[in-house]
Regions:
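Short, structured patches in soluble enzyme cores that scaffold and shape functional sites
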Residues: 94-96, 138-139, 158-162, 187, ...
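A contiguous strand-loop segment
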Residues: 3-14, 18-27, 41-179, 183, ...
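Short histidine-centered catalytic/ligand-binding loop motif
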Residues: 177, 187-192
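C-terminus-biased signal that marks the final domain/tail of proteins
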Residues: 1-78, 190-330
Length: 330
C-alpha cells in the first residue's frame, strides 16, 4: 500500500473536493474524518484491521479510507460476460467502469476520477501457506473484490444494480446501526476465499443478505457452469444460466435487469450482444471477447480497465483502457 499512497491520496482528495462542491461548509468531510472512522469497529475481521492498516500505511485518515471503499458500492457501471466455446471451455471478462458523475474534466474530455483510478489498478495473488487461493484485479486501498478467479474452480465479477432500494439505503441503515447486510465487495472476497465449488459459490451469492442490490456474474469449470444472479438486498430475483442445448452459450450483464430494457442513454447491452452473436460460439476466445469489450459504447469514457479470465490454471490478464474520441461519456 505504501507504494500507491500518493495515487490513493489523489483519488481521496478528488472525492473530498466533489463533496465540498455540494456541501461547501466542509461539514461532510469533517463528519467523514471524525465520525465514520469509528464505524470501522463494526466491520468483521479482517476487514476492520485491513482498513486501519491502509490508513496507517498511507497516512490518509481512516474515515476517508472507509469512504473510498463505500464508493464502489454506489458508483460503478460495468459490463461482464461469461461465454462457453464449442469445446466446453469457459471464458469470463469484464469492463470495469467507475466514476459516473464524479467530475468531468472539460480540458481532457474525461471523467476525473476514472483517470485517477487507473494508477491504482493492481493484480493480486492471494495465498495461504504459499499456495494461491485466488487471483484478483482490484484497486489498491479497496479491501473488497471486484473480480477474481479461483484456479480450476470458478470466476466471479460483480456489477452494481440500480434500484430505488439501493446502496444508499443500505449504507444509511448501516450508519444508523442496522448491520445485518454484507457489503458486496466483502461478499465476493469471502466467496473467493472460502467457496469450494461453483455450486457452493452460487449458493452463497444467492442467499447472503446484502447492503446493496447487485449482479453477480459467475463462471465455473464445466460446460454449462455460468450464470448472472440478480439480487435485491434481501433476495434473489433471477438466475440466468448458460444453457448450451437451448443455444444460450453466453450470459452478459451491464447494470439493468435482463427482462427490462436498458436506459436509452446507457445501452451497452445491445451492442455487446450484437458483437457476441456476430462473433459466434465457434470463434469465441479471450481475444475475441476483448474485441467485444472494445466496441463503443461498451468501451466508454468511464472504462478504467478490461479484465480477461479463464478458470483453468487461474489465468487472468488486465489492460488499462482509453476510449479515443468520439466516445460516449458512459
Amino acid at each position: 500500500m505504501h507504494d500507491k499512497k500518493t495515487e490513493l491520496k489523489t483519488v481521496v482528495q478528488n472525492i473530498k473536493d466533489i463533496a465540498n462542491t455540494f456541501f461547501p461548509s466542509g461539514k461532510v468531510v469533517d463528519i467523514v474524518d471524525n465520525k465514520i472512522a469509528h464505524l470501522t469497529a463494526t466491520l468483521p475481521y479482517p476487514f476492520n484491521e485491513e482498513l486501519q492498516g491502509i490508513a496507517n500505511s498511507s497516512g490518509i485518515p481512516l474515515g476517508e479510507i472507509v469512504i473510498f471503499n463505500i464508493f464502489y458500492e454506489i458508483f460503478t457501471v460495468c459490463t461482464s460476460i461469461v461465454a462457453e466455446d464449442k469445446t466446453g471451455k469457459l471464458y469470463h471478462a469484464r469492463n470495469l467502469d467507475f466514476g459516473l458523475f464524479l467530475g468531468w474534466d472539460v480540458k481532457n474530455n474525461s471523467w476525473t476520477l476514472t483517470r485517477e483510478l487507473k494508477p491504482l489498478v493492481v493484480n493480486l495473488d492471494f495465498q495461504r501457506n504459499n499456495k494461491t487461493v485466488f487471483k484478483s484485479t482490484n484497486f489498491a486501498g479497496y479491501i473488497g473484490m471486484v473480480s477474481g478467479v479461483k484456479p480450476d474452480l470458478f470466476t466471479l465479477t460483480m456489477n452494481e444494480r440500480f434500484s430505488l432500494d439501493g446502496g444508499y439505503v443500505g449504507i444509511f441503515e448501516w450508519f444508523l446501526g442496522r448491520r445485518d447486510g454484507m457489503w458486496m465487495g466483502f461478499l465476493t472476497r469471502s466467496v473467493l476465499e472460502n467457496a469450494t465449488s461453483y455450486q457452493d459459490a452460487k449458493e452463497k451469492l444467492a442467499k447472503t443478505r446484502l447492503l446493496a442490490p447487485a449482479y453477480f456474474i459467475l463462471g465455473g469449470k464445466n460446460s454449462g457452469e455460468g450464470c448472472v444472479i440478480t439480487r435485491s438486498r434481501t433476495a434473489t430475483l433471477d438466475i440466468w444460466d448458460l444453457d448450451i442445448k437451448k443455444g444460450t452459450w453466453y450470459v452478459l450483464e451491464t447494470n439493468y435487469d435482463r427482462w427490462k430494457p436498458p436506459l436509452i442513454l446507457d445501452n451497452r447491452r445491445t451492442p455487446a450482444m450484437k458483437c457476441l452473436n456476430q462473433t459466434m460460439q465457434e470463434n469465441i476466445s479471450l481475444p475475441t471477447i476483448y474485441d467485444v469489450l472494445s466496441t463503443k459504447p461498451v468501451l466508454n469514457k468511464l472504462t478504467v480497465c478490461t479484465t480477461l479470465m479463464a478458470v483453468y490454471n487461474g489465468h487472468t490478464e488486465t489492460y488499462l483502457r482509453e476510449c479515443p474520441d468520439p466516445c460516449s461519456p458512459w
